[in-house]
Amino acid sequence: MTTLAAPLVPSRDSDQNAQMGPKHNWLALVLPIWAGLYGLLIALNFERWSQLRFHDPDDQLRLQQVRDLLAGQGWFDLHQYRIDEAGGGVLMHWSRLVDLPIAGVMLAFRPLLGVQGAEMAALLLVPGLTLLAIMALVGWIGVRVLPRAALPMALLVVALAVPVIVQIQPGRIDHHGWQIALALVAMAGFLFEDDRRGGWLTGAALACWMAISFEGLPLSAWIIAALALAALADARLRPRLVATMQALALASVALFAATRGFGDLANHCDAIAPVHLAAFLWGAAAITAAHLVRPGSRTTLLAGLGVA
């Protein structure tokens, strides 16, 4: 197995079952902890949620953006026309990726609860599903790198960490919770035994993260840099680096086309722009070429990284 997390992964011997138990049991541990924790958050936030009082203006504006989408505003039209109405509205930088689960819950519950009831359901369910995704990813990772006895504590520590819990309160439907989940998906890719599959998962997760918000760029750069340094030290990790860069570049282009379209190629605040796509494609091409020319050469890879 060639993975950055190799020193942390427990050995595959008979001691593993005694230490951690069967891997398929991790979800049975995650679900009750998640249900208890989110039930507590609902109780603590019930009055705020029932009165439609938001934690942050971004959540309120996100709901309005989804309302407009379901009312017929174009998929690629991200203008908020209620802001600066005289000037033709303000173009929002927010990704439609985050709108999808909110819109899905609202559409699913409208026949049962009506329009307002469906909105209330989305404000309750979407943060809960985000927390479930985060805790499930922590469980999936933790069962592979931690003793089983430590897994409940890991779940609680992550879920109760201030940067996490403030983003998954009932009513918090903006993109920050999904950023946390995608960071964990990128980490999970390092635990895949297959370098190419793991690299593609990590790269695609980073692409989604930055498509949601360009705030993910610094941490994505650190992850790629750490992988590049590891690949320089260990030739077995070079296919993983290549796959990660390829997935990052190709998924970024696909997500840009699917959520922004090519009718607006200008730079916008906190959003991927064509110049970023060009940089990702150039970097992926340089590293891929270096690997194809001399797969085992540290010098060639270093040159490819320099060109990238």
Per-segment meaning from a language model:
Residues V98-I102, S252-R260, A308:
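C-terminal TM-helix exit segments that contain a strictly Trp-centered aromatic cap at the helix terminus
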Residues L44-V145, A150-V157, A161-L182:
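Active-site lumenal/periplasmic loops and adjacent helix-entry segments of GT-C-fold
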Residues L219-L301:
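Perimembrane helix-loop-helix junctions
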Residues F46-S50, P111, V115, P147, ...:
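Transmembrane helix-loop junctions in multipass membrane proteins, especially transporters and channels
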Residues M20-A28, M120, L124-P127, R148, ...:
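Membrane-water interface of alpha-helical transmembrane segments
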Residues W34-Y38, V126-I141, A150-D194, G198-L232, ...:
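Membrane-embedded helix bundles of polyisoprenyl
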Residues M1-E47, P57, P152, L292-V307:
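Start-transfer (signal-anchor) and selected internal transmembrane alpha helices
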Residues W26-V30, A150-M153, D195-L201, L237-A251, ...:
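Membrane-interfacial loop-to-transmembrane alpha-helix junctions, especially the N-terminal start
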